[in-house]
Amino acid sequence: MEPIYVTGHRNPDTDSIVSAMAYAALQNAIGERDYVPARLGHISDETQLVLDRFGFEPPVRIQTMRTQVRDLDYDTPPALSGAVTVSRAWAALQSNKAKSIPAIPVTNENGELYGMLSPSEIASYDMRTLSDSRVDKIPVFNLLSVLDGKILNESGYLADTISGEVSIALPQNNENLLFKGPDAIVIVGEQPEMARRAVEQQVSCLIVCQAELPEQLRQMQTNTCIIATPFDAYKAARMIYYAIEVARVCRTDDLEAFHLTDFVDDVREVVLKSRHRSYPILDENDKVVGTLSRYHLIKPRRKRVVLVDHNEAAQAVPGLEQAEIVEI
């Protein structure tokens, strides 16, 4: 429940401080709402003496009642690590929690903002793969994850990443092979002869779909990473492209981010001049805590305040016009 601040006047004297503390304590004792005593200036020596005499801490000091980003009902989608796969990122975008959110943040290893990801970035990447079949430096762990696969030749020297042109091997003569050398990722089915040729060519990776690999091929000394998957060749070929890290797909340029302490008036001016649909929100340590969109700014939740020991706006907390006055 959002707190209700109880404040006296500016340049507070002892009456103003004690009135705020007493009224907040009374309301907390008889009700279910959270009342917080607050002050609008420094504690005088006299007031501090009174507080010390009866064992009370001074009320929290507030500077303004202007609406801040922290007061908005902003979205809190799960932030994605830049190291997760595009496949997992897509699943996150399609989750119930994120379906209505235009974009979700991508973070670095420290939880700081790295980029923003929306379905349009994934769609754009997907279209690029139609004209460029090559992939570079896919972590083997990611590939195993998206293919639901397992390595069949763990005894060989295997790299941590794989690169190359992706091709589905079809039965054909050796001289007409579509792949050659280590710069290839080859997908085969129940084709032991084609699998043997791929291993002899020392391709970067051999993916065996819905088939068993002959034992002699498993025992061959090779640098080829051999992976078995329950997927068919077409699905395996598509999933390879979704194994790359989402940090290589997300938008990293022209990022607009706001902090929890930013005022909504200032945020609104920036948003109205921008074409982005979703904006990351950062805390005081620059960690991602959520996102906001234009509709969050339409009717922001106002801070609530009770005025004691005064009733003039000129003596009240700055930004009072943006607050909801609960009582005077």
PLM features: what roles do these ranges have?
Residues 46, 168-250:
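Feature captures the catalytic cores and cofactor-binding loops of soluble hydro-lyases/lyases
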Residues 128-193:
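Protease-associated
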Residues 71-79, 159-161, 179-185, 203-204, ...:
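Short, basic, glycine/proline-bearing loop/turn elements
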Residues 61-71, 137-142, 233-236:
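Short linear loop/turn motifs
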Residues 97, 118-121, 125-136, 171-173, ...:
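Beta-strand/loop-dominated core regions that host nucleotide or nucleotide-derived cofactor-binding catalytic loops
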Residues 71-76, 139-145, 151-156, 202, ...:
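Low-complexity, flexible helical/coil segments
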Residues 131-133, 203-223, 304-308, 315, ...:
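A signal for specific C-terminal beta-sheet/loop modules enriched in small/flexible residues
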